[in-house]
Amino acid sequence: MDATTPLLTVANSHPARNPKHTAWRAAVYDLQYILKASPLNFLLVFVPLGLIWGHFQLSHTLTFLFNFLAIIPLAAILANATEELADKAGNTIGGLLNATFGNAVELIVSIIALKKGQVRIVQASMLGSLLSNLLLVLGLCFIFGGYNRVQQTFNQTAAQTMSSLLAIACASLLIPAAFRATLPHGKEDHFIDGKILELSRGTSIVILIVYVLFLYFQLGSHHALFEQQEEETDEVMSTISRNPHHSLSVKSSLVILLGTTVIISFCADFLVGTIDNVVESTGLSKTFIGLIVIPIVGNAAEHVTSVLVAMKDKMDLALGVAIGSSLQVALFVTPFMVLVGWMIDVPMTLNFSTFETATLFIAVFLSNYLILDGESNWLEGVMSLAMYILIAMAFFYYPDEKTLDSIGNSL
C-alpha cells in the first residue's frame, strides 16, 4: 500500500444515504411547509370531524358546520399547491393553472350541488362570490390597509380596465334576468322558462369565448402589462409565507393538489347534502345560505391574502385579487356551470331575481365609483363593508321561492 493512500476512502467514510429515508424526510418537510403556509390551517381539525359526521349521518347541522369549516383551510392548501406548481410551469401554463384551479372549490361545490338538483344554491353562490369580492374584500382591504395611513394609491388605469370588463361581464349575466322580468307571468311560464334556458346557454358560450380571449390578452398579447403585478405577487407572498426559502417539488405539488381535491369533494358532498335539513332547522333561506354562507368557503383564503397584501401597502395586488376573482366568477365559473347543467340535463340558468339583479348592479356601481380616482382610505372601506352588511341583512329577511309562490297563490 502506498504511504499516500488513505486508510478509508471518501465513499467508505460516509455511508450512502437510504433513498427511502431521504424521500420520507422530504415528504415530512413538505407537509410541515404546507401546514404552516396559511394562518387558516388551524381549521384543519374540522376535516376529520366533518368526514366522520357526514359518513355516519350524525347531526345535520354539525355536519354542515364541520364541513363548512373544513373546506376553508383545504381551499388555502389547494391554492398554495396550485401556486407552487404554476411557478415551475412557466408564465403561460402557470397562468392557465391559476385560472383553472383558482376557483376549484367553487366549481367542486357547484357541480355537486347541481348533481343534487340544488340549482338555487348554485345561482346564489355565484352572485354571492361577486358581492363578497366587490364589497366585503374591497372594504376590508381599504380598512386594514388605510387605518394607519392618510390614503393609499393604486394604478388607476389598470383598476378601471378590470372594473370595466367586470361591468360588461355582469351586464351580460343580467340580460336573461331582465328578459324574464319584462315578460308577464301566467300560463305560458313553462314556455318562457324554456326560452330563458336557451338564452342562458347561448349567453354562457359567448361569455366563455370572451374569457378565453381575456386569458390570451393577459398571458399573451399584453403580458407586459401584468409583469409588474406578478413580481409584486412573488415578493409579497414570500414575505407572507412562514418559510419563504422552501418550495414544493412538482411531484409534491401534484400529490397535494389531487389529494386535497378529493378531500374537498367529500366535504362538499356532505355540506351540500345537509343544506335542506339546515334550512328546515334554522329557518334560513336557501338564497341566504348560497349568497352569504357558501361563498366564504371558497374565498376565505383569498380574503385573508388580500387583506395581508393591503396592509403591506400593495393595493394594486390587493385590488387585482379582489376584482380578478370577481372576473373569474363572472367570466368563467358562472357560464361554465350553465354548460355543466346542460351536459347533465339540469336546467341551470342565469335567471336571477329582480332583487338579486339590483344588488349586483349596486355592487358593481359602488366598486367602480370607489376606485375611480385611484386613491382609497379607510372610510371608503367602511362604506363598502356597510353596503355588504345591508345586502346580507336584506337577503336574511328575503323569503325563499316556496314562500313567494305560496304568497302569490293566496292573492
UniProtKB/Swiss-Prot annotation:
Assigned keywords, A-Z: Acetylation, Calcium, Calcium transport, Ion transport, Manganese, Membrane, Metal-binding, Phosphoprotein, Transmembrane, Transmembrane helix, Transport, Vacuole
Gene3D superfamilies: NCX, central ion-binding region
GO biological process assignments: calcium ion transmembrane transport; calcium ion transport; intracellular calcium ion homeostasis; transmembrane transport
GO cellular component: fungal-type vacuole; fungal-type vacuole membrane
An example Gene Ontology molecular-function term: metal ion binding
Impact after mutating L208P: In manganese-resistant mutant 1
Chief site of localization: membrane
Residues modified to Phosphoserine: S13
Function: Has a role in promoting intracellular calcium ion sequestration via the exchange of calcium ions for hydrogen ions across the vacuolar membrane. Involved also in manganese ion homeostasis via its uptake into the vacuole.
Residue spans, topological domain Vacuolar: 54-59, 115-126, 184-203, 276-287, 343-348, 399-411
Organism annotation: Saccharomyces cerevisiae (strain ATCC 204508 / S288c)
Transmembrane segments: 31-53, 60-82, 92-114, 127-146, 161-183, 204-226, 253-275, 288-310, 320-342, 349-371, 381-398
Superkingdom, natural source: Eukaryota
Compartments in which it is found: Vacuole membrane
Name the UniProt record assigns to this protein: Vacuolar calcium ion transporter
UniProt miscellaneous comment: Present with 7770 molecules/cell in log phase SD medium.
Bilayer topology: Multi-pass membrane protein
